UniProtKB/Swiss-Prot annotation:
Residues spanning the membrane: 402-422, 437-457
Biased composition (Low complexity): 14-23, 31-45
Gene3D superfamilies assigned to the protein according to its UniProt record, in alphabetical order: 2.40.128.330, Magnesium transport protein CorA, transmembrane region
Compositional bias of kind Pro residues: 46-67
Family, as annotated: Belongs to the CorA metal ion transporter (MIT) (TC 1.A.35.5) family.
Molecular-function GO term, any one: magnesium ion transmembrane transporter activity
Protein role: Putative magnesium transporter.
PANTHER family, per the entry: MAGNESIUM TRANSPORTER MRS2-4-RELATED, RNA SPLICING PROTEIN MRS2, MITOCHONDRIAL
Gene this protein is translated from: MRS2-G
Designated name of the protein: Putative magnesium transporter MRS2-G
Length: 468
Protein backbone atom coordinates (compact mmCIF):
# COMPACT_ATOMS: atom_id res chain seq x y z
CA UNK A 1 0.00 0.00 0.00
CA UNK A 2 2.91 2.32 0.72
CA UNK A 3 4.38 1.88 -2.77
CA UNK A 4 2.97 3.65 -5.74
CA UNK A 5 2.00 1.40 -8.67
CA UNK A 6 2.29 2.57 -12.24
CA UNK A 7 -1.34 1.92 -13.26
CA UNK A 8 -3.02 2.95 -10.04
CA UNK A 9 -4.32 6.50 -9.72
CA UNK A 10 -3.85 8.52 -6.60
CA UNK A 11 -6.77 10.12 -4.78
CA UNK A 12 -7.55 13.69 -5.62
CA UNK A 13 -6.44 15.01 -2.21
CA UNK A 14 -3.10 13.20 -2.53
CA UNK A 15 -2.53 14.60 -6.01
CA UNK A 16 -3.44 18.07 -4.81
CA UNK A 17 -1.06 17.74 -1.87
CA UNK A 18 1.78 16.60 -4.09
CA UNK A 19 1.07 19.40 -6.54
CA UNK A 20 1.02 22.03 -3.77
CA UNK A 21 4.25 20.68 -2.26
CA UNK A 22 5.99 20.73 -5.64
CA UNK A 23 4.71 24.28 -6.20
CA UNK A 24 6.09 25.38 -2.82
CA UNK A 25 9.45 23.80 -3.62
CA UNK A 26 9.50 25.58 -6.96
CA UNK A 27 8.71 28.96 -5.34
CA UNK A 28 11.38 28.45 -2.68
CA UNK A 29 13.87 27.51 -5.37
CA UNK A 30 12.99 30.68 -7.29
CA UNK A 31 13.31 32.79 -4.17
CA UNK A 32 16.70 31.39 -3.21
CA UNK A 33 18.64 30.57 -6.35
CA UNK A 34 21.99 30.41 -4.55
CA UNK A 35 20.88 27.75 -2.03
CA UNK A 36 21.07 24.65 -4.23
CA UNK A 37 20.45 21.29 -2.60
CA UNK A 38 21.75 17.97 -3.89
CA UNK A 39 19.07 15.89 -5.60
CA UNK A 40 17.95 12.98 -3.41
CA UNK A 41 18.08 9.53 -4.97
CA UNK A 42 14.89 7.51 -5.42
CA UNK A 43 16.15 4.63 -3.25
CA UNK A 44 18.65 5.70 -0.58
CA UNK A 45 21.49 3.22 -0.11
CA UNK A 46 22.41 2.51 3.48
CA UNK A 47 25.93 1.50 2.45
CA UNK A 48 26.85 4.99 1.20
CA UNK A 49 28.47 6.84 4.10
CA UNK A 50 27.49 10.41 4.83
CA UNK A 51 30.22 13.06 4.38
CA UNK A 52 31.92 14.15 7.57
CA UNK A 53 30.99 17.55 8.96
CA UNK A 54 33.45 20.37 8.31
CA UNK A 55 35.91 20.96 11.09
CA UNK A 56 38.63 23.45 11.79
CA UNK A 57 41.32 21.19 10.29
CA UNK A 58 39.22 20.38 7.23
CA UNK A 59 37.34 23.50 6.16
CA UNK A 60 34.37 23.21 3.91
CA UNK A 61 35.10 23.68 0.21
CA UNK A 62 33.94 26.98 -1.24
CA UNK A 63 30.68 27.02 -3.10
CA UNK A 64 31.01 27.16 -6.88
CA UNK A 65 30.35 30.51 -8.49
CA UNK A 66 26.98 31.18 -9.98
CA UNK A 67 26.80 31.03 -13.74
CA UNK A 68 25.54 34.20 -15.35
CA UNK A 69 23.18 33.76 -18.23
CA UNK A 70 23.69 35.68 -21.46
CA UNK A 71 20.59 37.73 -20.78
CA UNK A 72 21.92 38.77 -17.38
CA UNK A 73 25.26 39.66 -18.91
CA UNK A 74 23.53 41.88 -21.41
CA UNK A 75 21.72 43.73 -18.66
CA UNK A 76 24.96 44.32 -16.78
CA UNK A 77 26.64 45.65 -19.93
CA UNK A 78 23.95 48.26 -20.51
CA UNK A 79 24.56 51.73 -19.19
CA UNK A 80 22.83 52.75 -16.01
CA UNK A 81 19.71 54.83 -15.94
CA UNK A 82 20.56 58.52 -15.85
CA UNK A 83 24.16 57.97 -16.96
CA UNK A 84 25.69 60.58 -19.25
CA UNK A 85 28.73 60.62 -21.47
CA UNK A 86 31.88 61.98 -19.83
CA UNK A 87 35.46 62.20 -20.98
CA UNK A 88 38.23 61.69 -18.45
CA UNK A 89 41.60 63.31 -19.16
CA UNK A 90 44.47 63.27 -16.69
CA UNK A 91 47.48 65.55 -16.51
CA UNK A 92 49.50 63.25 -18.78
CA UNK A 93 47.01 63.44 -21.64
CA UNK A 94 45.56 59.95 -21.17
CA UNK A 95 41.86 60.16 -22.03
CA UNK A 96 38.88 57.83 -22.03
CA UNK A 97 35.13 58.16 -22.45
CA UNK A 98 32.86 56.91 -19.70
CA UNK A 99 29.14 56.62 -19.00
CA UNK A 100 28.75 57.81 -15.41
CA UNK A 101 25.70 58.58 -13.35
CA UNK A 102 25.39 61.20 -10.64
CA UNK A 103 26.34 58.83 -7.84
CA UNK A 104 29.58 57.85 -9.54
CA UNK A 105 30.50 61.48 -10.14
CA UNK A 106 29.74 62.40 -6.54
CA UNK A 107 31.91 59.58 -5.21
CA UNK A 108 34.69 60.27 -7.69
CA UNK A 109 35.00 64.03 -7.26
CA UNK A 110 33.59 64.47 -3.75
CA UNK A 111 30.95 66.98 -4.84
CA UNK A 112 27.57 67.69 -3.27
CA UNK A 113 24.56 66.81 -5.44
CA UNK A 114 23.57 70.46 -5.90
CA UNK A 115 26.78 71.12 -7.84
CA UNK A 116 25.81 68.52 -10.43
CA UNK A 117 22.53 70.35 -10.99
CA UNK A 118 24.57 73.33 -12.18
CA UNK A 119 25.94 71.15 -14.97
CA UNK A 120 22.44 70.03 -15.96
CA UNK A 121 20.34 71.38 -18.83
CA UNK A 122 18.36 73.70 -16.53
CA UNK A 123 21.42 75.85 -15.77
CA UNK A 124 23.01 75.50 -19.22
CA UNK A 125 22.74 79.25 -19.89
CA UNK A 126 24.38 80.25 -16.62
CA UNK A 127 28.13 80.71 -16.13
CA UNK A 128 29.82 79.74 -12.88
CA UNK A 129 33.21 78.67 -11.53
CA UNK A 130 32.84 76.96 -8.15
CA UNK A 131 35.63 75.84 -5.85
CA UNK A 132 35.10 72.82 -3.64
CA UNK A 133 37.36 70.82 -1.35
CA UNK A 134 38.71 68.42 -3.99
CA UNK A 135 37.34 69.71 -7.27
CA UNK A 136 36.44 72.77 -9.28
CA UNK A 137 33.13 72.96 -11.15
CA UNK A 138 33.33 74.86 -14.45
CA UNK A 139 30.17 75.84 -16.29
CA UNK A 140 31.15 78.30 -19.01
CA UNK A 141 28.76 78.34 -21.95
CA UNK A 142 29.17 74.97 -23.70
CA UNK A 143 32.05 73.81 -21.46
CA UNK A 144 30.80 71.90 -18.44
CA UNK A 145 33.52 70.09 -16.56
CA UNK A 146 34.70 68.94 -13.15
CA UNK A 147 38.40 69.53 -12.55
CA UNK A 148 40.48 67.95 -9.81
CA UNK A 149 44.18 68.24 -9.09
CA UNK A 150 44.94 65.26 -11.35
CA UNK A 151 42.17 64.94 -13.94
CA UNK A 152 39.27 66.58 -15.68
CA UNK A 153 35.82 65.12 -16.29
CA UNK A 154 34.26 66.78 -19.33
CA UNK A 155 30.53 66.45 -19.98
CA UNK A 156 29.30 65.75 -23.53
CA UNK A 157 32.73 65.81 -25.22
CA UNK A 158 31.38 64.85 -28.66
CA UNK A 159 29.33 67.99 -29.29
CA UNK A 160 30.45 70.35 -32.03
CA UNK A 161 31.26 73.24 -29.71
CA UNK A 162 33.24 71.13 -27.22
CA UNK A 163 35.46 69.35 -29.77
CA UNK A 164 37.90 72.32 -30.12
CA UNK A 165 38.29 72.40 -26.33
CA UNK A 166 39.03 68.66 -26.29
CA UNK A 167 41.66 69.11 -29.00
CA UNK A 168 43.33 71.90 -27.04
CA UNK A 169 43.36 69.78 -23.90
CA UNK A 170 44.97 66.83 -25.65
CA UNK A 171 47.60 69.05 -27.32
CA UNK A 172 48.59 71.38 -24.48
CA UNK A 173 48.28 69.47 -21.23
CA UNK A 174 50.85 66.69 -21.88
CA UNK A 175 53.46 69.24 -22.97
CA UNK A 176 52.98 71.45 -19.93
CA UNK A 177 52.81 68.72 -17.29
CA UNK A 178 55.33 66.27 -18.69
CA UNK A 179 58.39 67.84 -17.06
CA UNK A 180 58.70 69.94 -13.95
CA UNK A 181 61.39 72.46 -13.16
CA UNK A 182 63.93 69.86 -12.03
CA UNK A 183 63.60 67.73 -15.18
CA UNK A 184 61.68 64.91 -13.50
CA UNK A 185 58.09 63.85 -14.12
CA UNK A 186 55.67 66.05 -12.27
CA UNK A 187 53.66 63.25 -10.68
CA UNK A 188 54.28 60.12 -8.65
CA UNK A 189 52.43 57.85 -11.05
CA UNK A 190 55.24 55.29 -11.43
CA UNK A 191 55.18 54.25 -7.82
CA UNK A 192 58.42 55.98 -6.77
CA UNK A 193 58.96 56.04 -3.04
CA UNK A 194 60.66 58.72 -0.97
CA UNK A 195 63.25 58.16 1.64
CA UNK A 196 62.34 57.44 5.23
CA UNK A 197 63.64 60.76 6.51
CA UNK A 198 61.18 63.36 7.62
CA UNK A 199 62.33 65.95 5.10
CA UNK A 200 61.76 63.59 2.16
CA UNK A 201 58.38 62.33 3.37
CA UNK A 202 56.80 65.77 3.42
CA UNK A 203 56.08 66.98 -0.14
CA UNK A 204 57.43 70.37 -1.03
CA UNK A 205 55.27 72.89 -2.78
CA UNK A 206 58.05 74.32 -4.92
CA UNK A 207 58.63 70.92 -6.53
CA UNK A 208 55.04 70.76 -7.78
CA UNK A 209 54.85 74.34 -9.00
CA UNK A 210 58.15 74.18 -10.86
CA UNK A 211 61.09 76.51 -11.00
CA UNK A 212 59.47 78.82 -13.51
CA UNK A 213 56.18 79.22 -11.57
CA UNK A 214 54.27 77.05 -14.01
CA UNK A 215 50.54 77.05 -13.48
CA UNK A 216 49.09 73.96 -11.80
CA UNK A 217 46.91 71.51 -13.65
CA UNK A 218 43.55 73.02 -12.67
CA UNK A 219 44.63 76.51 -13.73
CA UNK A 220 45.85 75.20 -17.07
CA UNK A 221 42.43 73.64 -17.66
CA UNK A 222 40.72 76.86 -16.57
CA UNK A 223 42.95 78.87 -18.90
CA UNK A 224 42.13 76.62 -21.85
CA UNK A 225 38.41 76.80 -21.04
CA UNK A 226 38.47 80.60 -20.89
CA UNK A 227 40.53 80.75 -24.07
CA UNK A 228 38.07 78.51 -25.91
CA UNK A 229 35.07 80.51 -24.71
CA UNK A 230 36.69 83.84 -25.57
CA UNK A 231 37.67 82.53 -29.01
CA UNK A 232 34.07 81.44 -29.59
CA UNK A 233 32.82 84.87 -28.53
CA UNK A 234 35.36 86.57 -30.79
CA UNK A 235 34.30 84.49 -33.79
CA UNK A 236 30.63 85.25 -33.14
CA UNK A 237 31.29 88.98 -32.78
CA UNK A 238 33.31 89.03 -36.01
CA UNK A 239 30.47 87.28 -37.80
CA UNK A 240 27.95 89.78 -36.45
CA UNK A 241 30.15 92.68 -37.53
CA UNK A 242 30.38 91.28 -41.05
CA UNK A 243 26.61 90.82 -41.12
CA UNK A 244 25.82 94.23 -39.67
CA UNK A 245 27.64 96.44 -42.18
CA UNK A 246 25.78 95.47 -45.41
CA UNK A 247 22.43 95.08 -43.66
CA UNK A 248 22.55 98.54 -42.10
CA UNK A 249 23.80 100.18 -45.29
CA UNK A 250 20.94 98.60 -47.21
CA UNK A 251 18.49 99.83 -44.59
CA UNK A 252 19.69 103.41 -44.94
CA UNK A 253 19.11 103.23 -48.69
CA UNK A 254 15.78 101.45 -48.64
CA UNK A 255 13.52 101.28 -45.61
CA UNK A 256 11.51 98.15 -46.36
CA UNK A 257 9.92 95.40 -44.32
CA UNK A 258 12.55 92.88 -45.41
CA UNK A 259 15.45 95.10 -44.35
CA UNK A 260 13.78 95.93 -41.05
CA UNK A 261 13.29 92.22 -40.32
CA UNK A 262 16.98 91.53 -41.05
CA UNK A 263 18.00 94.29 -38.66
CA UNK A 264 15.65 92.94 -36.00
CA UNK A 265 17.23 89.46 -36.30
CA UNK A 266 20.70 90.95 -36.12
CA UNK A 267 19.82 92.96 -33.04
CA UNK A 268 18.33 89.95 -31.24
CA UNK A 269 21.46 87.87 -31.95
CA UNK A 270 23.60 90.73 -30.70
CA UNK A 271 21.60 91.05 -27.50
CA UNK A 272 21.81 87.30 -26.86
CA UNK A 273 25.58 87.28 -27.40
CA UNK A 274 26.01 90.30 -25.15
CA UNK A 275 24.11 88.52 -22.37
CA UNK A 276 26.40 85.46 -22.61
CA UNK A 277 29.55 87.60 -22.59
CA UNK A 278 28.24 89.61 -19.66
CA UNK A 279 27.59 86.46 -17.62
CA UNK A 280 31.13 85.14 -18.07
CA UNK A 281 32.58 88.59 -17.39
CA UNK A 282 30.54 89.00 -14.20
CA UNK A 283 31.66 85.57 -12.96
CA UNK A 284 35.34 86.44 -13.48
CA UNK A 285 34.80 89.81 -11.85
CA UNK A 286 33.18 88.10 -8.87
CA UNK A 287 36.25 85.87 -8.47
CA UNK A 288 38.62 88.82 -8.78
CA UNK A 289 36.81 90.66 -6.01
CA UNK A 290 37.30 87.82 -3.50
CA UNK A 291 40.84 86.58 -2.77
CA UNK A 292 39.50 83.79 -0.58
CA UNK A 293 37.56 82.26 -3.46
CA UNK A 294 40.65 82.44 -5.64
CA UNK A 295 42.70 80.72 -2.93
CA UNK A 296 40.14 77.90 -2.74
CA UNK A 297 40.57 77.28 -6.46
CA UNK A 298 44.14 76.11 -5.88
CA UNK A 299 43.45 72.38 -5.72
CA UNK A 300 47.08 71.31 -6.06
CA UNK A 301 48.03 73.18 -2.92
CA UNK A 302 45.22 71.50 -1.01
CA UNK A 303 46.38 68.11 -2.24
CA UNK A 304 49.97 68.79 -1.20
CA UNK A 305 48.84 69.96 2.22
CA UNK A 306 46.88 66.72 2.65
CA UNK A 307 50.01 64.81 1.67
CA UNK A 308 51.93 66.75 4.29
CA UNK A 309 49.40 65.74 6.92
CA UNK A 310 49.61 62.07 5.90
CA UNK A 311 53.40 62.19 5.94
CA UNK A 312 53.43 63.77 9.40
CA UNK A 313 50.95 61.20 10.69
CA UNK A 314 53.04 58.34 9.31
CA UNK A 315 56.21 59.78 10.83
CA UNK A 316 54.50 60.18 14.20
CA UNK A 317 53.12 56.63 14.04
CA UNK A 318 56.56 55.19 13.21
CA UNK A 319 58.06 56.85 16.31
CA UNK A 320 57.16 54.24 18.94
CA UNK A 321 59.35 55.66 21.71
CA UNK A 322 57.36 58.83 22.24
CA UNK A 323 54.05 58.41 24.15
CA UNK A 324 50.78 58.82 22.32
CA UNK A 325 49.82 62.20 23.79
CA UNK A 326 53.21 63.70 23.08
CA UNK A 327 53.19 62.41 19.48
CA UNK A 328 49.75 63.86 18.87
CA UNK A 329 50.79 67.23 20.24
CA UNK A 330 53.92 67.20 18.13
CA UNK A 331 51.85 66.14 15.15
CA UNK A 332 49.48 69.06 15.62
CA UNK A 333 52.33 71.51 16.07
CA UNK A 334 54.15 70.18 13.02
CA UNK A 335 51.00 70.28 10.96
CA UNK A 336 50.22 73.86 11.95
CA UNK A 337 53.79 74.95 11.34
CA UNK A 338 53.98 73.28 7.91
CA UNK A 339 50.59 74.59 6.82
CA UNK A 340 51.41 78.11 7.97
CA UNK A 341 54.78 78.03 6.18
CA UNK A 342 53.25 76.65 2.99
CA UNK A 343 50.42 79.15 3.10
CA UNK A 344 52.68 82.13 3.80
CA UNK A 345 55.11 81.12 1.04
CA UNK A 346 52.65 80.28 -1.70
CA UNK A 347 49.25 81.84 -0.98
CA UNK A 348 50.13 85.31 -2.25
CA UNK A 349 51.97 84.04 -5.31
CA UNK A 350 49.25 81.56 -6.23
CA UNK A 351 46.52 84.14 -5.83
CA UNK A 352 48.60 86.58 -7.82
CA UNK A 353 49.10 84.05 -10.62
CA UNK A 354 45.41 83.27 -10.75
CA UNK A 355 44.56 86.95 -10.52
CA UNK A 356 46.82 87.73 -13.48
CA UNK A 357 45.23 84.87 -15.42
CA UNK A 358 41.69 86.04 -14.69
CA UNK A 359 42.53 89.69 -15.34
CA UNK A 360 43.90 88.84 -18.78
CA UNK A 361 40.70 87.11 -19.84
CA UNK A 362 38.60 89.73 -18.07
CA UNK A 363 40.21 92.39 -20.24
CA UNK A 364 39.66 90.22 -23.32
CA UNK A 365 36.00 89.75 -22.45
CA UNK A 366 35.73 93.46 -21.76
CA UNK A 367 37.12 94.16 -25.23
CA UNK A 368 34.62 91.73 -26.78
CA UNK A 369 31.85 93.42 -24.83
CA UNK A 370 32.98 96.83 -26.11
CA UNK A 371 32.94 95.52 -29.68
CA UNK A 372 29.39 94.26 -29.18
CA UNK A 373 28.38 97.61 -27.71
CA UNK A 374 29.96 99.43 -30.66
CA UNK A 375 27.94 97.30 -33.08
CA UNK A 376 24.85 98.02 -31.03
CA UNK A 377 25.62 101.75 -31.14
CA UNK A 378 26.01 101.45 -34.90
CA UNK A 379 22.60 99.81 -35.08
CA UNK A 380 21.11 102.48 -32.81
CA UNK A 381 22.60 105.25 -34.94
CA UNK A 382 21.20 103.62 -38.06
CA UNK A 383 17.79 103.35 -36.41
CA UNK A 384 17.95 107.03 -35.47
CA UNK A 385 18.88 107.91 -39.03
CA UNK A 386 16.00 105.82 -40.36
CA UNK A 387 13.64 107.46 -37.88
CA UNK A 388 14.82 110.87 -39.09
CA UNK A 389 14.14 109.81 -42.65
CA UNK A 390 10.70 108.59 -41.70
CA UNK A 391 9.99 111.82 -39.83
CA UNK A 392 11.07 113.80 -42.87
CA UNK A 393 8.76 111.80 -45.08
CA UNK A 394 5.99 112.27 -42.56
CA UNK A 395 6.59 116.04 -42.57
CA UNK A 396 6.49 116.07 -46.36
CA UNK A 397 3.18 114.25 -46.27
CA UNK A 398 1.84 116.79 -43.78
CA UNK A 399 2.97 119.67 -46.00
CA UNK A 400 1.31 118.05 -48.99
CA UNK A 401 -1.84 117.60 -46.97
CA UNK A 402 -1.76 121.26 -45.94
CA UNK A 403 -1.28 122.39 -49.54
CA UNK A 404 -4.16 120.24 -50.72
CA UNK A 405 -6.33 121.56 -47.91
CA UNK A 406 -5.64 125.19 -48.94
CA UNK A 407 -6.39 124.39 -52.56
CA UNK A 408 -9.57 122.58 -51.54
CA UNK A 409 -10.61 125.65 -49.55
CA UNK A 410 -10.24 127.93 -52.59
CA UNK A 411 -12.17 125.52 -54.79
CA UNK A 412 -14.85 125.22 -52.12
CA UNK A 413 -15.29 129.03 -52.03
CA UNK A 414 -15.69 129.15 -55.78
CA UNK A 415 -18.13 126.24 -55.68
CA UNK A 416 -20.12 128.01 -52.96
CA UNK A 417 -20.49 131.11 -55.13
CA UNK A 418 -21.58 129.04 -58.11
CA UNK A 419 -24.06 127.13 -55.98
CA UNK A 420 -25.49 130.34 -54.56
CA UNK A 421 -26.29 131.68 -58.03
CA UNK A 422 -27.72 128.35 -59.07
CA UNK A 423 -30.55 128.74 -56.56
CA UNK A 424 -33.93 130.01 -57.67
CA UNK A 425 -33.70 133.55 -56.24
CA UNK A 426 -34.63 136.99 -57.57
CA UNK A 427 -31.62 138.92 -58.96
CA UNK A 428 -31.10 141.74 -61.50
CA UNK A 429 -28.30 139.79 -63.06
CA UNK A 430 -30.81 137.36 -64.49
CA UNK A 431 -32.31 140.17 -66.64
CA UNK A 432 -29.13 140.55 -68.71
CA UNK A 433 -29.73 138.45 -71.78
CA UNK A 434 -26.70 139.16 -73.95
CA UNK A 435 -24.35 137.26 -71.57
CA UNK A 436 -21.77 140.02 -71.41
CA UNK A 437 -21.60 139.81 -67.61
CA UNK A 438 -21.19 136.02 -67.24
CA UNK A 439 -17.58 135.56 -68.19
CA UNK A 440 -16.26 138.54 -66.25
CA UNK A 441 -18.18 137.35 -63.19
CA UNK A 442 -16.85 133.78 -63.41
CA UNK A 443 -13.33 135.02 -64.04
CA UNK A 444 -13.49 137.43 -61.13
CA UNK A 445 -14.71 134.85 -58.63
CA UNK A 446 -12.18 132.29 -59.78
CA UNK A 447 -9.37 134.83 -59.55
CA UNK A 448 -10.52 135.82 -56.09
CA UNK A 449 -10.47 132.19 -54.91
CA UNK A 450 -7.02 131.71 -56.45
CA UNK A 451 -5.73 134.79 -54.62
CA UNK A 452 -7.13 133.42 -51.38
CA UNK A 453 -5.13 130.20 -51.92
CA UNK A 454 -1.96 132.18 -52.67
CA UNK A 455 -2.38 134.25 -49.52
CA UNK A 456 -2.91 131.14 -47.38
CA UNK A 457 0.15 129.41 -48.87
CA UNK A 458 2.28 132.51 -48.28
CA UNK A 459 1.09 132.64 -44.68
CA UNK A 460 1.92 128.95 -44.15
CA UNK A 461 5.40 129.45 -45.59
CA UNK A 462 5.89 132.56 -43.47
CA UNK A 463 5.02 130.50 -40.39
CA UNK A 464 7.43 127.77 -41.64
CA UNK A 465 4.61 125.28 -41.93
CA UNK A 466 5.72 124.50 -45.47
CA UNK A 467 9.25 123.72 -46.57
CA UNK A 468 11.27 125.91 -48.95
Amino acid sequence: MGRRSGGRKLPFFASNASTSSSTKRTRSARRLPSLTRPRASSSPSPASPSPPPPSASHPAPPSPPLAVSPAGAGKVGKKKAGARLWMRLDRWGVSETLHLDKGSIIRRAGLPPRDLRILGPVFSDSSSILAREKAMVINLEFIRAIVTADEILLLDPLTIDVIPFVEQLTHHLPLKNLVCGNGQPGGDDHGEKHDDSHGDQVPRLNEATGAEHELPFEFQVLELALETVCSSFDVNVSGLERRATPVLEELTKNVSTRNLDRVRTLKSDLTRLLAHVQKVRDEIEHLLDDNEDMAHLYLTRKQLQNQQVEALISSAASNSIVPGGTSLSRLNNSFRRSVSIATSMHLDNDVEDLEMLLEAYFMQLDGIRNRILSVREYIDDTEDYVNIQLDNQRNELIQLQLTLTIASFGIAVNTFIAGAFAMNIQSKLYSIDDGSFFWPFVGGTSSGCFMICIVLLWYARWKKLLGP
